[in-house]
Structure formats: C-alpha cells, structure tokens
C-alpha cells in the first residue's frame, strides 16, 4: 500500500515537472505577437497607475488577465516572460482540474453520499486514467502553443474546465456552498473573456439535465449565475463598460445575418476546424479515441448502462464550437481553445479504453509512440526553431506578417543603449498593436526614450519626427518593409541602422533620421 502511494506520488511529480519543462523551455523563442503586446502594455499601465485598472475596456476587453499580469510583472524583468508565465500557470491549473474532472466523471454513478469521500475514492479508483488526461493535455500541440502565449485564452479554458468540474459536483451533491463557488468561477471566467457566456448557459443546462427529477434544486445554478453576473458587473465601476458589447459586434455576426446565410461562415469555419485539429491534435489520436469510445458505448449498451453523462462532455465541446463557427467573423484556433477541455477528456477516455483492448504491452507502447511522435516533433520544432516552421493559415500571424514581432526586442535593446547618451525619439508604424506597443513594453519607464505611433500609410517622414531632429534629438523610425510607403527622395535621406529578417521574406527596418 505504501509502495503504491509512493509510486503515484512520483507519477504526479513527474507530470508536474514534464509540464513546466515543456512550457518554460525556450519560452520567448516566438517573438511578441500583436495582441500580446497590447495586453502586456495594458498590464504595465495598470501596474504603474491604479486608476487605469479598467483601461482594457477602452477596446472592449475584459481585464482579469491584465490584472493578474500586472501583479506578475513585479517579479520578472522581461515583460514578455511575465505575460506568458500567467498562461503557463493557468495551464498548470488546467491539468489539475482535468485530472480531478476525469476522476469524478468516471465515478459519477457512485452511490457515495459524502462529497469528500467521493472525491478521494474517485481519485484512487481513476488515478491512471486521470493522469493520462493530464499527460494528453501536455502533449497536444494545440494546448502547448497557447500555454506559452500572453493571451487570455488559456485562462478562459481553465475557468471553463473549473466550471464543468464544479457543476458536475453540484449536480451530484446539490449544496449551497458548491453553488456559491461555481458562481465565483463563472464570474471570474466572465471577467476574462466574453465567450464565458457559454459556461453560464451550459452550467445551467448541465444541472437541469442531470437533476431533471429534482426541480426543487434548480435554484442552485440560478444562484451561481446571479453571483457570476454580480462579479461581472464589477466592470461597470470603470469607464466605457458599453465598449465590451460594442466590440463583441465586431467579432460576431448578428442573428439576422446568420439567418440570411446560415452556412456561411459555418461551413468554412468547420472546415478550418478540421484542419486545425489535424495540425494541432492529430487525426490518428482522434480516430483511435473515437474507436475506443464506440467500443465503450457498445459495451455499456449491452450491460444496459446508459451513457447519458457523456452527453454533458459532448455538449460542452460541440455546442460552443458550432456556435462560434456559425457566428464568428474571424475564426482562429485560439477562439475555440476553451472548447478543448471536454474534448480532451473524451479523447483520453476513448484512447485508454482502446489501449485496454490490446493485450500486448509492447504493442501498446508502439502505438503510443506512433500516435504522439508527430506531436512531440512539432512541440520540439516550434520551441527550438519557430522561424522556419509553418503554422496553419489561421495561425500564421504569430510567426509572419506585421503581427509578429521579430526584431522588436533587439531594436529596443539598441534604442535603450542610445538613450543613455542622447534624448531618443522613435516613430513606429501603427498606433495600436505589435508596433508601437511591442516596442513600448520593452522600453517602459526608460528615461530619455520616447516612442510615438505614427499610424499607417504615410508617404513622407512624419513632421513630428523631423521637428524632433531639428531640435537636436536622436530620431529613429521603426517600420516593416512591407508597410514602407515613404517616397524614394525622403527614403534616401534615412540611414538604415538595423534590419531584422522575418519568415515571410519581410524585414523589420530601423532607420535613423
């Protein structure tokens, strides 16, 4: 018994070490991405000035991720590391929740009446299937990629999985304390990103579905939703709360538009989902898991064991996915990341059931290697050499185009050195995004260094930069070659100081006036 506990303890420690090693190695090999630059810059502003804690709302974004990042910024000198660490720890919380979620899901039909004994027995009985779920999360490129980005999506996924875990517990043990905790989880999810509304609807639907014979207990999830709504309305303390709803309209089609063309964008977005799953999960894993689930359902049907609880996982995965595909104007992998926890549990259960049908341990090992070798290879390459990697078309902006920040940190290092001996003024392309925010995060609170976003499409050197030069300042212009529109006469008057290659044959150019 003691030996078994020690082995399980070692397995837990190994999973934790594997997670942190996989997420922290080469953490900044991918340069700052446009949205990362914006979120980190907001966090810096919040950290430096408390009255700006609601500044993300000016662009219609909920601020929880930035609030957490503002705290973490105190412990790291590199702002990009600070922002990405938030996602790393959100992902770590997610593997813990997935472990617990798998355990209680597999034991959901238990007759145990005490919640703590139920949790303990579920973990003991389903330890290794639950560990496999956590391992699966670590080895899927989909989750690996976004756990290492300073974006709010992994944090949203964590709260989504936590809400699913809590509503399953609440459904089995209808208690007011669980209802209150679920309400706080829903509220925090809502403070993270707008898609948390799916968790609100699904939590209520899940409870009603699993407790339809106990209508007197339906008030519990309603209390949860009420608490979540109260927490969300904290945002009304800040200015421009209405911008959240207005900006949401920029990302989704209205119901009227959807009814006019119900298959567009639904069909192309579902096709994109097919390729995203192929690239970032792998079809061998999905096909084997599906086969395992079918075998499990056939076995349960013969034993007259209903598979109703699996409908909960399927709905938490497929309904938000279809809703996003039908409504989203812009569709990328990160916008469906929050649907993955339920899918990962289904994959884990199906795959382990398929493995259990195989008698040869050698064949099991060979199958595991064959299924995961491509995923591990992708993880290695995107970590060590992202410059030469190709992502699916919906994700290319992380490595190519103006949204990728190749050369920005090196430009900032050079400019900070110059600021020690001169008053430096830097004009950049853009007014919001990778530039100038990407440069500002690396030069925050640096004396004698001022960064100005000059917008797009200018054909002459901005007058403000010329004036600064005439007043004796050291003046620079940072711009992507693909966006350089300055006429040849003025371009000849600029001195190219540095250039940084980008994977799409573009360059980031640093000129001095």
Annotate each predicted stretch with a short phrase.
Residues 367-505:
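Catalytic lumenal/periplasmic loop and adjoining terminal transmembrane helix
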Residues 8, 12-16, 223-227, 300-301, ...:
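Signature aromatic-anchored transmembrane alpha helix within multi-pass, membrane-resident enzymes
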Residues 33-34, 87, 142-156:
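Short acidic/glycine- and proline-prone juxtamembrane loop motifs at membrane-interface regions
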Residues 16-19, 130-138, 165, 186, ...:
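Short helix- or helix-capping micro-motifs
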Residues 106, 110-114, 119, 123, ...:
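Membrane-interface transmembrane helices that cradle and orient dolichyl/undecaprenyl
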Residues 39, 188, 197-309, 318-320, ...:
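Transmembrane-lumen/periplasm boundary regions of multi-pass, lipid-linked membrane glycan transferases
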Residues 63-67, 76-96, 146, 150, ...:
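Loop-to-helix entry region of an early transmembrane alpha helix in multi-pass inner-membrane enzymes
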Residues 6, 128-131, 166-187, 362:
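Short hydrophobic alpha-helices at membrane interfaces in multi-pass membrane enzymes
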């Amino acid at each position: 018994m003691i030996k078994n506990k020690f082995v399980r303890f070692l397995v837990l420690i190994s999973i934790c070490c594997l997670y942190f090693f996989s997420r922290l190695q080469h953490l900044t090999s991918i340069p700052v991405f446009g949205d990362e630059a914006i979120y980190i810059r907001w966090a810096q502003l919040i950290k430096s000035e408390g009255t700006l804690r609601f500044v993300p709302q000016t662009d219609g974004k909920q601020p929880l991720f930035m609030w957490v990042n503002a705290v973490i910024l105190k412990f790291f000198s590199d702002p990009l590391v600070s922002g990405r660490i938030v996602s790393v720890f959100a992902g770590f919380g997610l593997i813990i929740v997935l472990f617990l979620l798998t355990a209680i899901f597999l034991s959901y039909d238990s007759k145990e009446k005490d919640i703590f004994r139920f949790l303990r027995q579920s973990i003991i009985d389903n330890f290794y299937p639950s560990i496999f779920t956590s391992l699966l999360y670590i080895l899927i490129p989909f989750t690996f990629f976004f756990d290492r980005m300073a974006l709010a999506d992994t944090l949203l996924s964590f709260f989504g999985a936590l809400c699913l875990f809590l509503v399953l517990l609440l459904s089995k043990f209808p208690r007011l304390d669980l209802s209150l905790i679920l309400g706080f989880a829903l509220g925090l999810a809502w403070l993270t990103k707008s898609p948390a509304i799916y968790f609100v609807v699904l939590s209520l639907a899940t409870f009603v579905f699993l407790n339809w014979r106990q209508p007197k207990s339906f008030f519990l999830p309603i209390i949860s939703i009420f608490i979540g709504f109260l927490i969300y309305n904290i945002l009304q303390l800040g200015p421009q709360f209405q911008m959240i709803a207005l900006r949401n309209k920029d990302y989704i089609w209205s119901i009227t538009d959807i009814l006019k063309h119900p298959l567009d964008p639904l069909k192309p977005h579902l096709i994109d989902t097919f390729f995203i799953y192929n690239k970032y999960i792998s079809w061998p894993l999905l096909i084997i898991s599906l086969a395992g689930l079918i075998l499990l359902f056939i076995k349960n049907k013969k034993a007259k064991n209903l598979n109703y609880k699996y409908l909960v996982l399927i709905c938490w995965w497929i309904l938000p996915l279809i809703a996003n595909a039908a409504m989203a104007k812009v569709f990328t992998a990160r916008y469906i990341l929050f649907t993955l926890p339920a899918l990962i549990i289904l994959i884990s259960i199906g795959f382990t059931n398929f493995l259990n049908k195989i008698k040869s341990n050698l064949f099991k090992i060979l199958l595991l290697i064959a299924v995961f070798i491509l995923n591990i290879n992708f993880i290695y390459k995107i970590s060590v050499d992202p410059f030469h990697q190709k992502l699916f078309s919906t994700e290319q902006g992380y490595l190519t185009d103006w949204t990728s920040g190749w050369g920005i940190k090196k430009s900032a290092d050079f400019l900070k050195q110059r600021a020690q001996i001169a008053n430096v003024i830097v004009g950049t392309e853009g007014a919001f995004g990778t530039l100038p925010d990407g440069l500002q995060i690396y030069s925050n609170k640096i004396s004698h260094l001022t960064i100005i976003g000059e917008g797009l499409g200018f054909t002459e050197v901005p007058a403000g930069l010329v004036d600064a030069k005439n007043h004796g300042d050291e003046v620079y212009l940072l711009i992507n070659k693909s966006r350089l529109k300055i006429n040849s006469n003025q371009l000849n008057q600029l001195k190219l100081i540095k250039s940084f290659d980008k994977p799409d044959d573009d360059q980031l150019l640093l000129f001095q006036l």
